[in-house]
């Protein structure tokens, strides 16, 4: 269980390191092994790591591939990462780690958004594609790994839990429809709703 967060700003402001730190503090229990931040102007990622597959520092995140101009934060486990890694090596890609994180970066570069069709596992991740100035965010098909977001006219902000997003400026009022669902559906609020108006869940 790791924790991821990030922000992409649309206004004249750059992403604040303090803002990322605030979100990461609410994710710390999800990833006690290491933490990392990456900021580049209007985009920034934070990560709290629980080491599972590649225990070395080569698996630390946010993971930046300068050659492919991709940056990734990822929470989860890709069960078929070894076979995907072999497949991508056969297509000319090289790897500097043994992590499933790096496999996602290469898979995204090769297959684009369709990379999720090849991933067998539980995951939530976000990729910044510098070349195309595009942010891509995804969850596993069953929605095992959580991912929440806030979208305003100033920024798109995401995190592994709602507590992290509550450190940001957003509408913190209660969503009455979600409250009704919470009380009547055995505590389940279907995506994209959450109990907070300013926070949504990424659909699986």
At which residue positions do the language-model features occur?
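Cysteine-centered catalytic environments shared across enzyme families
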Residues: 1-204
């Amino acid at each position: 269980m790791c924790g991821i967060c990030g922000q992409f700003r649309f206004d004249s402001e750059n992403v604040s390191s303090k803002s990322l730190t605030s979100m990461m503090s609410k994710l710390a229990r999800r990833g006690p092994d290491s933490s990392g931040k990456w900021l580049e102007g209007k985009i920034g990622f934070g990560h709290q790591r629980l080491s599972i597959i590649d225990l070395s520092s080569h698996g630390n995140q946010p993971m930046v591939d300068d050659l492919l101009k991709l940056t990734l934060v990822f929470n989860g486990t890709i069960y078929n990462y070894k076979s995907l890694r072999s497949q991508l090596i056969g297509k000319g890609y090289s790897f500097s780690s043994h992590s499933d994180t790096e496999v996602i970066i290469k898979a995204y570069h090769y297959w684009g958004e369709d990379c999720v069709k090849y991933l067998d596992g539980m995951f939530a991740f976000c990729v910044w594609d510098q070349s195309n100035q595009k942010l891509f965010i995804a969850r596993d098909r069953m929605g095992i790994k959580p991912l929440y977001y806030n979208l305003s006219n100033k920024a798109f902000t995401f995190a592994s839990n709602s507590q992290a997003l509550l450190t940001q400026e957003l509408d913190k009022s209660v969503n009455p429809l979600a409250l009704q669902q919470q009380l009547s559906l055995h505590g389940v609020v279907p995506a994209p709703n959450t109990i907070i108006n300013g926070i949504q869940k990424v659909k699986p």
